[in-house]
Amino acid sequence: MESLRIYNTLARDKQVFVPRQPGEVRMYVCGITVYDYCHVGHARMLVVFDLVQRWLRAIGYRVTYVRNITDVDDKIIRRAVENGESIKSLTDRFIGAMHDDEAALGIQRPDIEPRATQFIPQMLGMIEQLEANGYAYQASDGDVNYSVRKFANYGKLSGKSLDDLRAGERVAANDAKEDPLDFVLWKRAKAEDPEGASWASKYGMGRPGWHIECSAMGCTLLGEHFDIHGGGQDLQFPHHENEIAQSEGATGQTFVNYWMHNGFVQVDNEKMSKSLGNFFTIREVLERYDAEVMRFFIVRTHYRSPLNYSDVHLDDARASLTRLYTALKDVEPDALALDWNEPYAQRFAAAMNDDINTPVAVATLFELAGEVNRTRDASLARQLKQLAGLLGLLGREPRAFLQQGAGSAHAGALAADEIEARIAARVAAKQAKDYAEADRIRAELLEAGIALEDKPGGSTEWRRV
């Protein structure tokens, strides 16, 4: 099997992946700020790094996967105040909702899922170390800021220089900062802050800045120098750039070896975002499409490419997934273990080892499905299920998927017992040689999204289309 190569944002190139410790991978991914339901952009991040950790494990690595939860933040505080509820009540509720969405999408839970509020002492310890090392200062407004000009390599991840940033970036004016580009490490508490929004420190009551949270959690849980850090493309700057400045400023050593970023979700060629009002929650999508269809929709696009969201693309994903399940419908896979020397497995592995190239991996699944359709071979059917399983797909009994179709998208459609009753009426019509009535029932069911397949021996199977 070829070596795994991943695109490292820091190097701006694909690189052979070499872990710091042979056979072990330590990976941190920036998770979700929990003040609302997860949207399609969150779904993409969750699925992408679920695929990454699944593949790392599949090729033999022992993985420690950390994905954090941001449970203290200005948006969280505002939403809690608007709702008239405590911060903990709000965040607990949306963490539960996030876990429900993850389960629906087949996301395997990370090995460690830290909440930011559990690591306040570690954040303060890192801030104090930065202050001791000359990178941090307390401003006249009480905030503690990071002095970006003190960090010689600031901009190495994003490729942005300080001069370019000062000339071209919109930076909120703050007379208390030594430099407009300096960012906050510790925010001084405000009189109107609700309970649970601030902690005691040598700098006064306050709460951590967004960037220090991930630096402290990553270094505490995975060590000061680890293998992979992931997140959405929108986090590359300033969040991940600032994480590097903080972590390396505090420890004096390299923070992360490989940086991975998934691309944006787009609607009509614009980034999906709340500010543009063109975003959809995972729950809204799952009202109309089966969760595995949504997962497949995400999987079949390369993780670094833009993902174009539309009903047309989801409908196509549903039709494509139906083709894969249909190939398995009447074949009982054998029970052998996956053999990486098998030709289809080799091609699948080559694709995944080429920067998690899921479009090529999925194309291999369709070639394999075509062979299963042609030969009805139990070994090929087993390979199809096993390889798809590494992507979190084809885990259901084929008839269950085909008859359930788009899941809740069929709310209000014919129920299974109604379909069976009409099939029975069609059988009776055929037995009475009333073929016109039998054809009418078939056409009526097809109009309702139900396709019939007459089998040898007189039985009839059905599936939703």
Curated annotation (Swiss-Prot):
One GO process term, biological-process aspect: cysteinyl-tRNA aminoacylation
Residue span of motif 'HIGH' region: 32-42
Required cofactor names: Zn(2+)
Keywords: Aminoacyl-tRNA synthetase, ATP-binding, Cytoplasm, Ligase, Metal-binding, Nucleotide-binding, Protein biosynthesis, Zinc
EC number: 6.1.1.16
Keyword Transit peptide: no
Subcellular location(s) per record: Cytoplasm
Motif placement: 'KMSKS' region: 271-275
Residues at which ATP binds: K274
Ligand binding (Zn(2+)): C30, C214, H239, E243
NCBIfam families referenced in this protein's UniProt entry, alphabetically: cysS
Subunit structure: Monomer.
Protein name: Cysteine--tRNA ligase
Organism: Burkholderia vietnamiensis (strain G4 / LMG 22486)
Lineage: Bacteria, Pseudomonadati, Pseudomonadota, Betaproteobacteria, Burkholderiales
Gene coding for it: cysS
